[in-house]
Every structure is written in C-alpha cells, then in structure tokens.
C-alpha cells in the first residue's frame, strides 16, 4: 500500500478525512519531502472526488523558509497545491509573495505576527509559521476545517510536542533518517525543550557513533524505535476513564472510583505523589506529563503492576532508559487518547554523514517496527 493509501485507510477507519501530522525525529530527515509528497499525491489515489476537497496546511512552529535558521543549510521549500488553505503568520505570508490570498483572521499570534487563513492562488513556495501551544494548534486545525479544508496536514517536529498530540491530529507520520546521528542536526532538544523524543535521544545519544553502515543504521533504528515506543502508548483499558475529560491527577481504585491528588501539579512533587498514592490503586492518572522526577520516585518506591495513565504519548517526558525501567517493573504507560503512528519515512542521506544503502535502512526499520516504512525518494 502507498503512503497516501495508508491515509485513505485511516479515513475509512475513522469515517472522516484524517488530520495528519508529519513529524521529524531530527533536522534533515526528510520531513518536508514527506509533506510535499503527500500534498502532491493526496488527490491521485482512490476517489477522484478527493481532489475537489481543499487540503489544509499549518505548522506547529515555523517551516518552509529558504535556509535553516540554525545550520544555514538550504531547506526544501513547501509547495501546497493551488486551492489549498494555509494557516500561517502575517510575516510568513508576506514572504510567500503572491502565492497566498487572505481569507480570514484567527485569534492567534506568533512572533511573526497574527496567524491568518490564506488560500493558495499560485504554485509557488510558501512559508508556514503557526502557533505552538496545544490549544492554539488544535484551534487552528478547527478553523481550517471551518473554512473548507477537508483534511489538515500539520508540519511538526518531535520537539514541538503539540504537533503529534491526539488533540490536534488523528494520525502521525514519522520521518526519520541518518541525520539523527549528525552533531547539531540530529540532537533533539537543543533549544532546551526536553520533550518526548529529546528525552529519548538524551538517553541514547552518548553511545559512540558506529564505524560501519550497518552499525550506524542500527543506531538510527534504536533511536527511532525509542521515539515510536514513547509516542504510541496503548490505550488505557480502564473504562472509568473512557470519554472522561477528568482534569485531575489522582488514583483509580478497584471498582472505578477516582481519588484526586489535591496538591495540584506533580512536576516537582514526585516523592510526595508516590507517598500519597493509595496502596490499592490500580492506576495513577496524570493530568499532565510523566516527568523524570515522578518516574524516578515511582522506581524508588516498591510499587509494581501499576498502570500510569497520561493524556497521550506526547506527555512522556522521562528519559528513554527510565521509560524502559518502568516497564520492566510492571509500571506500564497507557494513554487516555492514544496517538496513531501510521507510517515511517526513511532518509538514508545526511548533510554530515555518508549515505547508507536505502534498502538496508528501510529493511532494518521494517524489521524493528510494526509499521510500514517508505523511502519516498528511492521508491516514490
């Protein structure tokens, strides 16, 4: 099945056109190539009626600029088809020249100005800068839908947590590749935003780089698998949480009763939270993130066979080794709203590393992950 075909299968499962985030595990792994591939082909697989429904496009953060702001390397531009709807900040829209026509304003602002809804009127590159908070990213997707977009693609990154959230999109395509090994280009969280994958990389990055293609591929596979594991947590089976908008952190007891943790935020109160946790609790429900502080407090306790329920996989902010240790103890991470990782795209090239054989990289990722893997350049 092709990559667009996987999206159409997701549509059939949901009964509606899926909103999808394209998320890169690092710089230069082919995220924009994946985005352009989908923008070009979404109307070509399946029913021809799809091509009559405008695609919506936004970014959690900024993308589509000519040169990377950190590395100064040229970046692939974003080419949405004419008729598409784009949510982007004012100065980014101005830099897109005559490609965009204003449709409507939004209540959201970024450092590049007010985010507006624009229609693509010329086949030229556009620059996209959208809001970065979870609520505003979700609101932007809703506004694109309201103005006629049938499906919204979100240009994201793994260190922009909102881009992969189940509150924003109904599926994620993860772009990965050999640039994960590049100094600077592949180290996530360099801005200090220690999110899901940057925690994973922080735990895995210290290993010396392998000397052979096979060894380097194995390192990329391990890092990618860590990201996928932390993002795609299984759904919580606790029926008491089904459909709940329960805002509190607390304990789920046998029989489904819920006891809230009254002190509030758990970010710096891991030991206090674990001491409070009732002995009979079946699950610890976290309103926000599972931090390293809380995870270490759980490991230091004698708790076993306890479910740890977070909103979704973007709320896992502990180190990858800590994540694995929790599972080994029987402290199993679950999500109230699971993230559906639909596919992996693989890039065998990197700015600062020799290219590895595409077939070898794709095969290694395919063997390690229960997901379809594509090299969209070698096998479009």
Residue ranges, per PLM feature:
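Hydrophobic/aromatic beta-strand patches that form the interior of the parallel beta-sheet core
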Residues: 20, 56-58, 170-173, 342-345, ...
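Short, basic, glycine/proline-bearing loop/turn elements
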Residues: 19-25, 118-130
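A generic structural motif
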Residues: 57-60, 309-314, 372-380
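N-terminal phosphate/diphosphate-binding loop that engages ATP/GTP or pyrophosphate donors
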Residues: 38-120, 331, 367
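A noncatalytic interaction/capping subdomain that flanks phosphate/NTP-handling catalytic cores
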Residues: 1-10, 63, 99-122, 336-344, ...
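Short, glycine/acidic-enriched capping/hinge loops at junctions between secondary-structure elements
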Residues: 32-35, 66-70, 164, 184-186
């Amino acid at each position: 099945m092709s990559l667009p075909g996987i999206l159409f299968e997701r549509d059939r499962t949901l009964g509606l056109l899926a909103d999808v985030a394209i998320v890169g595990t690092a710089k230069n792994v082919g995220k924009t190539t994946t985005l352009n591939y989908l923008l070009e082909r979404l109307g070509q697989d399946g029913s021809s009626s799809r091509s009559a429904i405008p695609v919506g496009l936004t970014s959690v953060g900024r993308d589509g600029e000519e040169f990377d702001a950190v590395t100064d390397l040229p970046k692939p531009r974003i080419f949405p088809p004419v008729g598409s709807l784009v949510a982007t900040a004012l100065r980014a829209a101005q830099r897109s020249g005559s490609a965009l026509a204003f449709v409507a304003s939004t209540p959201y602002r970024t450092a590049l100005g007010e985010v507006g809804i624009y229609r693509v009127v010329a086949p030229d590159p556009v620059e996209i800068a959208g809001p970065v908070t979870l609520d505003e990213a979700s609101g932007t997707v809703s506004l694109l839908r309201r103005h006629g977009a049938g499906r919204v693609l979100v240009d994201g990154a793994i260190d922009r947590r909102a881009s992969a959230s189940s509150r924003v999109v109904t599926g994620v395509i993860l772009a990965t590749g050999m640039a994960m090994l590049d100094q600077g280009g592949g180290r996530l969280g360099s801005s200090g935003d220690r999110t899901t994958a940057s925690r994973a990389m922080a735990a895995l990055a210290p290993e010396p780089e392998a000397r052979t293609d096979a060894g380097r591929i194995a390192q990329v596979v391990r890092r990618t698998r860590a990201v996928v594991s932390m993002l795609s947590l299984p759904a919580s089976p606790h029926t008491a949480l089904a459909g709940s908008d329960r805002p509190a952190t607390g304990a789920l007891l046998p029989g489904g009763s819920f006891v809230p943790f009254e002190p509030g935020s758990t970010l710096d109160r891991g030991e206090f939270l674990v001491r409070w946790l009732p002995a009979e609790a079946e699950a610890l429900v976290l309103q926000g993130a599972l931090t390293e502080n809380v995870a270490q407090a759980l490991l230091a306790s004698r708790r076993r066979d306890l479910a740890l329920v977070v909103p979704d996989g973007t709320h896992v902010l502990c180190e990858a080794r800590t994540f694995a240790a929790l599972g080994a103890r029987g402290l199993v991470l679950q999500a109230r709203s699971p993230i559906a990782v639909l596919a992996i795209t693989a890039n065998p090239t990197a700015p600062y590393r020799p290219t590895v054989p595409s077939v070898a990289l794709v095969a290694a990722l395919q063997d390690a992950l229960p997901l379809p893997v594509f090299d969209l350049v070698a096998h479009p």
